[in-house]
């Protein structure tokens, strides 16, 4: 059992701004009474009474020296609170249960993947890419489809049947008409949830509906590109009325699927289901053209798997080439995630000589003539 002393508080980092950390103190910490000075305090014992729920903190120099990073979502120990100024110092970071690098969030429990069924229209390839990226985190995935009021019930059923074949049960919502917002709130209760999805699908509007008076900036869909404009610039956790924290993340339209070629197949529920009832002949099967492959077959996202596999192989090859300075090819990423190899220019051969080097060369020449 972890032991704290009086003057130490427990909380969660909800925002990072430069070298400052906004820490939300635990509810039980804020509600329970104080103890005598110098007395040890256990996690199951009353902690000091806190006049404030949020403190703006810095990181102790000791943590900087040992390279301890502080992330949004981290459980931290805060000491020496200045209640008048609303300040404190982070003395320790508790062990993380989970960690995401992009976006940088610790201790997340699940991903709420938000897409729209219309305006912008639902793109199966883009959705598939987001789903695979979400699967790579190891977190539970909750898929919700916004703007359901813009399509008929028949279209909703077609979309639902299609996604069920992918291995996902979508929840149709409408922020505009407050459809199924209460049901979404039940999924988020007492958990740290990361909201993800492309720009323009209504992520910020959904958060505004779930957390009244938060007033997140909401953008419109670009008429020319039929894509949303970015309105979220950084990662921040917001407290839900019924408990739990919600992380709004910057929207993007084509997430990187940066897993290894060998791992990729396990991020498709359809492929996992096939591998659960049969095995491939070869242990290193890539599920492309090998004989007696259990994965290859007539399932809709198999073509997506092949495209993502080609990207993963190209990325792995690029890493090998970066480690090999003698390589004569380099991988260039073009539009829409397409990649191709190009000849690598000889190092420094085509670099213009600096004026300083030219002057030094002339000085050496004069010295030789003398």
Swiss-Prot record:
It holds the Pfam family RsgA_GTPase. Its EC number is 3.6.1.-. Residues 97-255 form the CP-type G domain. GO terms for cellular component: cytoplasm. CDD domains: YjeQ_EngC (cd01854). Binds 1 zinc ion per subunit. Disulfide bonds: none annotated. GTP binds at residues 146-149, 197-205. It is found in: Cytoplasm. GO terms for biological process: ribosomal small subunit biogenesis. SUPFAM superfamilies: Nucleic acid-binding proteins, P-loop containing nucleoside triphosphate hydrolases. Its cofactor is Zn(2+). Monomer. Associates with 30S ribosomal subunit, binds 16S rRNA. Belongs to the TRAFAC class YlqF/YawG GTPase family. RsgA subfamily. This is Small ribosomal subunit biogenesis GTPase RsgA 1. It comes from Nostoc sp. (strain PCC 7120 / SAG 25.82 / UTEX 2576).
